[in-house]
């Protein structure tokens, strides 16, 4: 059949992906599975089919394609279907609040949510964000993130996600999604998948940094590691009913993430049973037909490059369907998936047009900002959507603060005669809290890292402000030195202080911004802004020095953590707008710290393994990142190589003490696991496709410059394609089976949301007594780890946890269950999960290396 030039581009990446035999290869999987409305999607699927059946081809295409960068109010907007009262969908960053807006909250980052180990707080944060997005007229929140997972401790965007542990991430990822969608907004699980570093994630971005590479980095991963580590939290997201998944910039095994048929068609749609829609990351769309057949459902922001006025889809998708290159059922499936997600969250009952503009804070402006066209209208209504969310933000900030060391220094009493506040991180950014675009600097206290995963602060309470308020209420004295290079002034203040509170940080972010020479990823994992010298100077002059770390992840503290005058260390992460109040609540004992570290604190960067790829290592070809570490990242790596961390994964102190006892295991009457078999139904067409004359630009339409439309210029499809190569035969670019709409075999590991339903069947019930043995109320997090027993398996892997609040001397019984999935490994040969015959042992404790309770499990099927 025939297609336009734009569709041909990069088609080879959809099937045969490696020009060199020695490079990783992503096997093809076709056709793209069509939604079937399984499980809780049944009702909304029927509604979606009904409405899509009434649409014309161009109306369907309009749903799939963004209108172009900066051409509507949101960072991404689809076309609309006015005839059927379907509005343009507004898609907006970020995972921690509304980007490019005003009168919105700036929530703690995902890494802080991970540190709470609190499912309820994850849900409440998601719900609060969803409420704000909805109130601003946003239909799709571009978050939360579980990619990157955190294979590299210095990866630039780890903080947007949760933890390098897939189970901890998966649970909190799912709870966040539920919260967002219960508020009536479609959540987006991103960045799918293996988007583990910023260097080379986009070829044009790499070129801007002086690298001569032809393609984006390829994350090369084996099947077992993919399933047991990186895909794990996305299975939880699908099981939670997520409406959208965003495919990533990078390649996976040398096939781009947004046209990788293995990851989109096979893993996400066929195996995990994802019923929602896949959108591209912004300009991560590299081909027309190739991406469509490989499982992409929505192109964002619609144009090939920002403001190019050209699109892989839009009119080109219309041409592809009309000339038979793309089967009708594929574009119908795209539209059904989008509408099903829209109905699933009840967006049709909560819809309101966007009441803000991403591109200006002025009240009035052009409807189409970038080209200064359309009506000159009110584009910002300044709607305050914050509600009472500041209280929740403050609570999460405090409950995510990890107490790493306490030699009697904390909590403070307000009776300290003189408090010294030391370090730039205690103070404010002299340019203002939002003084750097997308937070692309490290000035003052760090409460949010940089990139598109940010939001504007409505205000930012600094540690200096909050702690000074505490001290003055106690009629004490406070000196602040917030110049981290003024070591003589820091020493002088520390010598006089009853307690020195030292604030230090380490920042990172997205690769399009470079901060102090850090191109998204961190150059190292040391403290920024002379932090180590600030700590040592204070500790050498004050015998009661407490260090507070605001960071995106682990930092090296080996130089000073065991200094005798360092009496306390706290990690406060990226706590958002209430930063100062949150840390003051912990320092002064209003909140008893109960957080646990969501990552390992190593003595050196080398102790983590998993180095970033920072140099072009494949000539001018795509840089290759080989994930040869397999499942051994973070604490799993430390355990395997007998590396002793400073503070282990799951570690965190309290102002009280706890005791765990009485571990009991009860086998449950579970059925035998049955691999899924049989066939799907055949693909269906919804509605009729007319001839080309029905899809030509309407007469009298006043076109907006660079706007992406679904209509074609002419009934002559070759002319509409503007392609000298129009007329290629299918065999040259269409992968085998890619257009086959007949019934397809079901995968053994498929069958329900998140995979085979048998994976989620409970095999054992486990109970443990938890007692507060101290004198103050506090929170403990019992953690259950499993040894899977095999010779090449991690020593232990986290599977269950719960944050429990207990009064002094109070005792509670924590009960949980272990599913088949919790005990299974991925069998590469069978392409299914299996509980191996190796002995299984469970361990319960309060960190990955403090596991006093253990029990062997009976053999399970």
From Swiss-Prot:
GO terms for biological process: carbohydrate catabolic process; cellulose catabolic process. Pathway: Glycan metabolism; cellulose degradation. Glycans are attached at residues 62, 212, 253, 316, 323, 355, 443, 524, 543, 565, 669, 713, 846. The active site is at residue 281. It is found in: Secreted. One of its GO terms (cellular component) is extracellular region. Its EC number is 3.2.1.21. Residues 1-19 form the signal peptide. InterPro entries: Cellulose_deg_GH3, Fn3-like, Glyco_hydro_3_AS, Glyco_hydro_3_C, Glyco_hydro_3_C_sf, Glyco_hydro_3_N, Glyco_hydro_3_N_sf, Glycoside_hydrolase_SF. It comes from the Eukaryota. Its main location: secreted. Residues 730-754 are annotated as: Disordered. It catalyses: Hydrolysis of terminal, non-reducing beta-D-glucosyl residues with release of beta-D-glucose. Keywords: Carbohydrate metabolism, Cellulose degradation, Glycoprotein, Glycosidase, Hydrolase, Polysaccharide degradation, Secreted, Signal. GO terms for molecular function: beta-glucosidase activity. PROSITE patterns: GLYCOSYL_HYDROL_F3. PANTHER family: BETA-GLUCOSIDASE, BETA-GLUCOSIDASE A-RELATED. Belongs to the glycosyl hydrolase 3 family. Beta-glucosidases are one of a number of cellulolytic enzymes involved in the degradation of cellulosic biomass. Catalyzes the last step releasing glucose from the inhibitory cellobiose. This is Probable beta-glucosidase A. It comes from Aspergillus oryzae (strain ATCC 42149 / RIB 40).
């Amino acid at each position: 059949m025939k297609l336009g030039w734009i569709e041909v581009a990069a088609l080879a990446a959809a099937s045969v992906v490696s020009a060199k035999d020695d490079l990783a290869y992503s096997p093809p999987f076709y056709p793209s599975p069509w939604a079937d409305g399984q499980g809780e999607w049944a009702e909304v699927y029927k509604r979606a089919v009904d409405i899509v059946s009434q649409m014309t081809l161009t109306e369907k295409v309009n749903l799939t394609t963004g209108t172009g960068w900066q051409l509507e109010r949101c960072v991404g907007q689809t076309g609309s279907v006015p005839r059927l009262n379907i509005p343009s969908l507004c898609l907006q960053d970020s995972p921690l609040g509304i980007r490019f807006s005003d009168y919105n909250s700036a929530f703690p980052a995902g890494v802080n949510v991970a540190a709470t180990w609190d499912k309820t707080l994850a849900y409440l944060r998601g719900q609060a964000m969803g409420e704000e997005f909805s109130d601003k007229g946003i239909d799709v929140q571009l978050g939360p993130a579980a990619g990157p997972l955190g294979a590299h401790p210095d990866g630039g965007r780890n903080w947007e996600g949760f933890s390098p542990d897939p189970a901890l991430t998966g649970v909190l990822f799912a709870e966040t999604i539920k919260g967002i969608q219960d508020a009536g907004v479609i959540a987006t699980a991103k960045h799918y998948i293996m988007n583990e570093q910023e260097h080379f994630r986009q070829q044009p971005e790499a070129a801007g940094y002086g690298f001569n590479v032809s393609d984006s980095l390829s994350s090369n991963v084996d099947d077992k590691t993919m399933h047991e580590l990186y895909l794990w939290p996305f299975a939880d997201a699908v099981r939670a009913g997520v409406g959208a998944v965003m495919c990533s910039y990078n390649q996976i095994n040398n096939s781009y993430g947004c046209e990788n048929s293995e990851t989109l068609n096979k893993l996400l749609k066929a195996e995990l049973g994802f019923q929602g829609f896949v959108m591209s990351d912004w300009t991560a769309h590299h081909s027309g037909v190739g991406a469509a057949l490989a499982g992409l459902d929505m192109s964002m922001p619609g144009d090939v490059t920002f403001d190019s006025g050209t699109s892989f889809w839009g009119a080109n998708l219309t041409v592809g369907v009309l000339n038979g290159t793309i089967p009708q059922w594929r574009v119908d499936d795209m539209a059904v998936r989008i509408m099903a997600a829209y109905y699933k969250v009840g967006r049709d009952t909560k819809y309101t047009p966007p009441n803000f503009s991403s591109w200006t804070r002025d009240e009035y402006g052009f409807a189409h900002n970038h080209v200064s066209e359309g009506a000159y209208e009110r584009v910002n209504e300044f709607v305050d959507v914050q509600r009472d969310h500041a209280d929740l933000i403050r609570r999460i900030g405090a409950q995510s603060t990890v107490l790493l060391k306490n030699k009697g220094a904390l909590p403070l009493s307000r009776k300290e005669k003189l408090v010294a506040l030391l370090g730039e991180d205690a103070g404010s950014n002299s340019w203002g809290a939002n003084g750097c675009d997308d937070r692309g600097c490290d000035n003052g206290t760090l409460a949010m890292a940089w990139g598109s995963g940010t939001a504007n602060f409505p205000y930012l309470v600094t540690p200096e402000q909050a702690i000074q308020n505490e001290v003055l209420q106690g009629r004490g004295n406070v000196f602040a030195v917030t110049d981290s290079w003024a070591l003589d002034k820091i020493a002088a203040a520390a010598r006089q202080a009853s307690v020195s509170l030292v604030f230090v940080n380490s920042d990172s972010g997205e690769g399009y911004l470079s901060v102090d020479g850090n191109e998204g990823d961190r150059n190292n994992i040391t403290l920024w802004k002379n932090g180590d010298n600030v700590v040592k100077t204070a500790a050498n002059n004050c015998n009661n020095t407490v260090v507070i770390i605001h960071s995106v992840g682990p930092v090296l503290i080996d130089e000073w953590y065991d200094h005798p005058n360092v009496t306390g260390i706290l990690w406060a992460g990226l706590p958002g707008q209430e930063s100062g109040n949150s840390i003051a609540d912990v320092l002064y004992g209003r909140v008893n710290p109960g957080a646990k570290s969501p990552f390992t604190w190593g003595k050196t960067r080398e102790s983590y393994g998993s180095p970033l790829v920072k140099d072009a290592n494949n000539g001018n070809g795509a840089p290759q990142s080989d994930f040869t570490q397999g499942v051994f990242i973070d604490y799993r790596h430390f355990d395997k190589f007998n590396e002793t961390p400073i503070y282990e994964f799951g570690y965190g102190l309290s102002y009280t003490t706890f005791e765990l006892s009485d571990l009991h295991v009860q086998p449950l009457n579970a059925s035998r696991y049955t691999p899924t078999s049989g066939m799907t139904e055949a693909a269906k067409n919804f509605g009729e496709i007319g001839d080309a004359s029905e899809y030509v630009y309407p007469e009298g339409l006043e076109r907006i410059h660079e706007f992406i439309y679904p209509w074609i210029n002419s009934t002559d499809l070759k002319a509409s394609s503007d392609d000298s190569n129009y007329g290629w035969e299918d065999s040259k670019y269409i992968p085998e089976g890619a257009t086959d709409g007949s019934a397809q075999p079901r995968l053994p590991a498929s069958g329900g949301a998140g995979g085979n339903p048998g994976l989620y069947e409970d095999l054992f019930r486990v109970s443990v007594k938890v007692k507060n043995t101290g004198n103050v109320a506090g929170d403990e997090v019992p953690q259950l780890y499993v040894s899977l027993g095999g010779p090449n398996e991690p020593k232990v892997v986290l599977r269950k946890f719960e944050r429990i609040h207990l009064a002094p001397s109070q005792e509670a019984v924590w009960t949980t269950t272990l599913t088949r999935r919790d005990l299974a490994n991925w069998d590469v040969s069978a392409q299914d999960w299996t509980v191996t015959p190796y002995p299984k042992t469970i361990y319960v404790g309060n960190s990955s290396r403090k596991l006093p309770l253990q029990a062997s499990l009976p053999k399970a099927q």
